[in-house]
A protein has these predicted regions:
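Short beta->alpha transition motifs characteristic of CBS
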Residues: 5, 106, 113, 124-131
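Long, continuous compositionally biased terminal/linker segments
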Residues: 38-83, 90
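A short linear hydrophobic-aromatic micro-motif
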Residues: 31, 57-58, 96-99
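N-terminal beta-strand motif that seeds the catalytic metal site of vicinal oxygen chelate
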Residues: 1-16, 71, 128-131
Length: 131
């Protein structure tokens, strides 16, 4: 099981605004800012997002290779997948595939996929057998 993921973004303020909008339908919020000076030498400043008291998705400013990561966010139902996709598109995402069944994985696998402003692949996913 994963505990957290860091991604590097080219414009931290733009990315915070994007993720605040895109993740809101999933009840994932910008939860904490971490000052790198509080960590070991060379630790980056971080902007953390999470839900239910757990921070698990972190942004850091830097040089980007946006196609190097794919992140899937859990939705609690089909309406949340649809809402997250719509929010991400309204916030400037680029479409990879609109919401729908991903039959190549499983007929019950419902998801949408977008690219964030840095080109990262984001998936909003609902798997009814995992809820």
């Amino acid at each position: 099981m994963l505990d957290h993921v860091f991604i590097t973004v080219s414009d931290i303020d733009r990315s915070i605004a994007f993720y605040e909008a895109a993740l809101a339908p999933l009840d994932i919020v910008h939860a904490v800012d971490y000052d790198g000076k509080d960590g070991p030498p060379g630790h980056p400043d971080l902007k953390g997002f999470g839900a239910n008291g757990r921070v698990f998705f972190w942004l850091r400013q830097g040089a980007v290779d946006g196609r190097a990561a794919h992140v899937g966010f859990v939705a609690v139902g089909i309406p949340e997948v649809d809402a997250a996709y719509a929010a991400a598109m309204a916030a400037g995402a680029k479409d990879i595939h609109p919401p729908g069944a991903q039959r190549h994985y499983d007929p019950r696998y419902y998801a949408a996929q977008v690219r964030d402003p840095d080109g990262y692949s984001l998936e909003f996913v609902y798997k009814d057998w995992q809820h």
